[in-house]
């Protein structure tokens, strides 16, 4: 009987040693892999480029500015009441985005005059004209892509030409009445 109990104690001790050894190996492997995983995270300079704040106070009604965000041009336009009205009168059924292209969904509530768009044509990546006062704004008063003739309206929606979708709206928020944070 004593030898049988001794064998059980040996098996329990062996199982414990195997378990402890495996746990020790797992902790060792994790501590070796951690630096390799951490080096894949973005550093402080990359994180700083992921968002940008823009002061909108100097931009008067009817004016537009272009800023860079993640290396892409972002169009910011302080739209006039006439531009907003024209954008909202459009029959949404005739637009590629349908009801998802409603002007109200492309701007922030309470700041409907501010339109923020990624300034890259969705056809082949050209930069549309329409930001400067003398630029051609296309047939719909918004932007015109000179590469292949896409026309966007005052809400950045594709109205004519080969572009497959509307100009993209980047993630942004108003941090105050005159400042936005993109990204």
What name fits each language-model region?
Residues 24, 28-31:
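Residue-level signal for the membrane-embedded core of alpha-helical transmembrane segments
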Residues 89-183:
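Rieske [2Fe-2S] iron-sulfur-binding domain
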Residues 51, 62-66, 142, 169-171:
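Short, acidic/polar N-cap/turn motifs at the starts of alpha helices
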Residues 1-2:
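N-terminal intrinsically disordered, acidic low-complexity segments at the extreme N-terminus
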Residues 5-24:
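N-terminal secretory signal peptides and thylakoid transit peptides that target proteins
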Residues 53-83:
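Short extracytoplasmic
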Residues 48, 59-61, 166:
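Residues that act as N-cap/strand-start positions at coil-to-secondary-structure junctions
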Residues 32-52:
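Aromatic-capped interface at the extracytoplasmic side
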């Amino acid at each position: 009987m004593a030898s049988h109990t001794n064998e059980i104690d040996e098996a329990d001790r062996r199982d414990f040693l195997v378990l402890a050894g495996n746990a020790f190996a797992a902790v060792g492997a994790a501590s070796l892999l951690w630096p390799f995983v951490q080096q894949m995270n973005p550093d402080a300079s990359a994180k700083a480029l992921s968002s940008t704040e823009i002061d909108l106070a100097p931009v008067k009604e009817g004016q537009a500015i272009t800023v860079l965000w993640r290396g892409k041009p972002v169009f910011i336009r302080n739209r006039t009441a006439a531009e907003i009205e024209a954008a909202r009168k459009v029959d949404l059924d005739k637009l590629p985005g349908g009801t998802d292209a409603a002007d109200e969904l492309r701007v922030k509530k309470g700041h409907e005059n501010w339109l923020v768009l990624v300034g890259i044509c969705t056809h082949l990546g050209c930069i549309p004209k329409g930001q400067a006062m003398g630029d051609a704004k296309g047939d719909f008063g918004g932007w015109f892509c000179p590469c292949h003739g896409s026309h966007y309206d005052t809400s950045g929606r594709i109205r004519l030409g080969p572009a497959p979708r509307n100009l993209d709206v980047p993630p942004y928020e108003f941090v105050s009445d005159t400042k936005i944070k993109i990204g």
